[in-house]
């Protein structure tokens, strides 16, 4: 069980709401603009300390209020941990177990939530940094010291770039290059290992959603394939000096999704690409659940967006089969929902920011 109780205050059009979700499927019904997505946004805030819809807190806080508050209990019945996020227009407070935290890292580790929504397709269509963020979030949950490793690499990269620009007289480019190669190689190896572990789950999800077996994940470390990072830095040194910054490295890392050996985004329809993205995110959730049973939460917004009824039912059936605590929003026609979920789901109705338990 991940989320035992949720209390929301002043998140967009939700003035005040409380709910006790079920441990499996939680279905949220309501018209467009009713507050369904805002409810998912509140859960995401409780998991990551930030919104997935806007980086500007003023757009998330109810228009006439100074701040928003989302709090809840995470864990198992009788042993829940109190967590909370208070977000003002220029400040944020995160609390875990009644104590303030310096960052959201403890919250993220305690309550991992995976989000699937219509814009998730940008994960495959968008820039590499979004795919790096997905990888790094996943590695963070399986490697205890990964966040510190990323910070070490970032600091060392800044130092090497300063030498390249001539802003650090007396510093040795060779020394910083050696340090950078050490941290960068470790990051690339951890990302590659993580992607290897996702592949099995991903293949199962792709088969269930698209019926394909010719989809593969290919890692790109951020430098020439087959080279060590140290060799790539040495070869790139003249270019780096001219540019004033370090060109190769995990800061340029990426991964590709190929279908029949071709980039998925150049081969599949938008609906198929969306299903492929959902398969990737479900695979990430499945891997994390295998490592940390009972702690993962799945958020699925607007399941009907750009999917026909058959694919909606496939996706909902797959979400149900994961056994994860899941929150799924619906608007409009929902004829196939009952046939897929039976009587196992907990149902909520959202109307103008108010939430009530239904059937």
Swiss-Prot record:
Localization annotation: Cytoplasm
Q: Which SUPFAM superfamilies match?
A: P-loop containing nucleoside triphosphate hydrolases
Gene3D superfamilies hit by this protein? P-loop containing nucleotide triphosphate hydrolases (3.40.50.300), RecF/RecN/SMC, N-terminal domain (1.20.1050.90)
In the record, biological process GO terms are: DNA replication; DNA synthesis involved in DNA repair; double-strand break repair; SOS response
Q: Which SMART domains match?
A: AAA
Q: Could you confirm whether the keyword DNA damage appears in this record?
A: yes
Instruction: State the function annotated in the UniProt record.
Output: The RecF protein is involved in DNA metabolism; it is required for DNA replication and normal SOS inducibility. RecF binds preferentially to single-stranded, linear DNA. It also seems to bind ATP.
The entry's family comment says: Belongs to the RecF family.
Protein name, as recorded: DNA replication and repair protein RecF
Recite the lineage of the species: Bacteria, Pseudomonadati, Pseudomonadota, Gammaproteobacteria, Methylococcales
């Amino acid at each position: 069980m991940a989320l035992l109780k949720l209390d929301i205050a002043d998140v967009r059009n939700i003035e005040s709401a409380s709910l006790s979700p079920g441990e499996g499927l939680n279905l949220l019904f309501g018209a467009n603009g009713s507050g369904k997505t805002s409810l998912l946004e509140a859960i995401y805030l409780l998991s990551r300390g930030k919104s997935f819809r806007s980086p500007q807190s003023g757009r998330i806080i109810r228009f006439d209020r100074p701040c928003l508050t989302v709090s809840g209990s995470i864990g198992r019945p009788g042993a829940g941990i109190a967590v909370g996020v208070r977000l003002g227009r220029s400040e944020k407070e995160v609390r875990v177990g009644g104590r303030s935290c310096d960052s959201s890292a403890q919250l993220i580790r305690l309550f991992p939530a995976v989000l699937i929504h219509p814009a998730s397709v940008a994960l495959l269509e968008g820039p590499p940094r979004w795919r790096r963020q997905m990888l790094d979030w996943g590695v963070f949950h399986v490697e205890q010291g990964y966040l510190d490793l990323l910070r070490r690499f970032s600091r060392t990269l800044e130092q090497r770039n300063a030498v390249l620009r001539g802003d650090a007289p007396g510093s040795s480019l060779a020394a910083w290059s050696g340090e950078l190669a050490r941290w960068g190689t470790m990051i690339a190896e951890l990302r590659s290992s993580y992607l290897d572990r996702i592949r099995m789950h991903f293949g199962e999800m792709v088969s269930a959603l698209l019926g394909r077996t010719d989809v593969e994940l290919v890692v790109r470390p951020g430098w020439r394939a087959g080279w060590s990072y140290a060799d790539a830095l040495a070869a790139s040194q003249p270019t780096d000096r001219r540019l004033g910054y370090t060109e190769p490295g995990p800061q340029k890392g990426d991964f590709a999704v190929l279908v029949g050996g071709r980039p998925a985004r150049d081969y599949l329809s938008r609906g198929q690409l969306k299903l492929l993205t959902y398969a990737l995110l479900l695979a990430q959730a499945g891997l994390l659940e295998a490592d940390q049973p009972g702690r993962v939460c799945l958020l699925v917004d607007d399941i009907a967006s750009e999917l026909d009824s058959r694919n909606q039912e496939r996706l909902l059936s797959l979400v149900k089969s994961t056994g994860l605590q899941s929150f799924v929003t619906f608007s409009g026609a929902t004829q196939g929902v009952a046939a897929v979920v039976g009587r196992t789901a907990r149902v909520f109705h959202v109307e103008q920011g108010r939430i009530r338990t239904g059937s």
